[in-house]
Amino acid sequence: MNIKPEEITSIIKKEIEKYEKQIKTVDSGTIIQVGDGVSRVYGLDDCMEGELLEFPNDVYGMALNLEQDNVGCVLLGNEEGIKEGDIVKGSGKIVEVPVGEALIGRVVNSLGEELDGKGPINTNQTRPIEVKAPSIIDRSSVNEPLQTGIKAIDSMIPIGKGQRELIIGDRQTGKTALVIDTILNQKGKDVICIYVAIGQKQSTVAHIVNTLTEMGAMDYSIIVSSTAADSAPLQYLAPYAGCSIGEYFMNQGKDVLIVYDDLSKHAVAYRTMSLLLRRPPGREAYPGDVFYIHSRLLERAAKLSEENGGGSLTALPIIETLAGDITAYIPTNVISITDGQIFLESDLFNSGQRPAVNAGISVSRVGGNAQIKAMKQVTGTLRLELAQYRELAAFAQFGSDLDKDSKKRLEKGKRLVEILKQDQYKPLEVEKQVIILYTAVNDFLSDIKVEDIKKFEKELLEYVDTHYRELGRQIAEEKVLTDEIKAKLEVAIVEFKKIFLQEA
């Protein structure tokens, strides 16, 4: 049997082609200490700050401290089963979260994993949780209103799309209720809402999910939840994950509203991590860069220019104060980062004024440019009149005799305060707010008893809706109170008032 050399050569070549040896180099290290959700790893010579690390048992970690002879990491999962001597591998990338339309209506954790039992999230797109904020050139000014549906806010402290408005107040003053109402008010307005729960009770988050589902708001909402049961690193990552999910929609030219509830607990989670990593503590034991963790998060809220799609990300961070002290470290930090704040006060809340907005020290630095003209026309003097009322009310407590003009102002102030009260889960369309506030500011309520104002408001809106339906539509479309609209509105108010007073 003759075997030709060519045949042997071809057989050898085929065999060599089959044999592929790939060498894969992985940056790795050894755990030298683990506990309290923190680990120190020896090795990882090419590790980067914020890099995603692979621990045993399918647990991931994040490198935060790059020291001379070891790397300080935080674990993004359960540390059970991880021990000294285990191998840790570097991934060469930072933490990413899944993004896309598939997340709408879902409840996810800080890593974008589902928590609602509705099955896996079908998306193959991911986005890093740390992204550089849009530059000045990429932005446009805030010029479109984001209606909250709350009279006290849309009239005096208007919020624009792309703004960062802080909601600050003690515990149990209605901060979360206020943002939930704002989310409910976005129904049908083509705004995607993201609610980030940081360090809250699981029962609270479940209640919010149920409320949004019942009201039909989960159709355009996403909830990112990192509850008190989660480790500090997961609580720390939650707002950045929520922000990345929101930025995906913003870059597509959509409007997004994101709520961080709340950044006080976020700062506490970061302080916990930093102290466990042996970083030097500063004021109130917070690390020196606690300002930076919030500023880099909130700077990502923006109104993009038309060339970049014109999308927006509006941020409503929440801060919880202790005994109304807004001069503490974290409150002052976040006040200085945001474009204004809505201050909720316990005293107002307990006296029955809800939402308990203190109009005196609440401010919106950029929202005024976004407010519709009709609302500006109506509420030009509202803040001043409320301030004068408070001053007079304090003066009247001493039992001093007031002149006729002061008494008139006092009575009007009482009615203005009453008209700004609003029930929870009942946001109002902006045209209805304009009608009600026009009635109050222009002294149409002077002969209505204070206790009848709520009833008057409800029935007036029903009357206008039945007999003057085109009036609300005109205000909504033209966004300005022309002389013709004012005349029609005054006729409607006078007609209804006559009926109301006869019934009373």
Swiss-Prot record:
Keywords: ATP synthesis, ATP-binding, Cell membrane, CF(1), Hydrogen ion transport, Ion transport, Membrane, Nucleotide-binding, Translocase, Transport. It is found in: Cell membrane. The keyword Ion transport applies. The record marks S362 as: Required for activity. ATP binds at G169, D170, R171, Q172, T173, G174, K175, T176. GO terms for molecular function: ADP binding; ATP binding; proton-transporting ATP synthase activity, rotational mechanism. It is a peripheral membrane protein. Its main location: membrane. GO terms for cellular component: plasma membrane; proton-transporting ATP synthase complex. It catalyses: ATP + H2O + 4 H(+)(in) = ADP + phosphate + 5 H(+)(out). Its EC number is 7.1.2.2. F-type ATPases have 2 components, CF(1) - the catalytic core - and CF(0) - the membrane proton channel. CF(1) has five subunits: alpha(3), beta(3), gamma(1), delta(1), epsilon(1). CF(0) has three main subunits: a(1), b(2) and c(9-12). The alpha and beta chains form an alternating ring which encloses part of the gamma chain. CF(1) is attached to CF(0) by a central stalk formed by the gamma and epsilon chains, while a peripheral stalk is formed by the delta and b chains. NCBIfam families: atpA (TIGR00962), PRK13343.1 (NF009884). PANTHER family: ATP SYNTHASE SUBUNIT ALPHA, MITOCHONDRIAL (PTHR48082:SF2). Produces ATP from ADP in the presence of a proton gradient across the membrane. The alpha chain is a regulatory subunit. This is ATP synthase subunit alpha. It comes from Clostridium botulinum (strain Alaska E43 / Type E3). The gene is atpA.
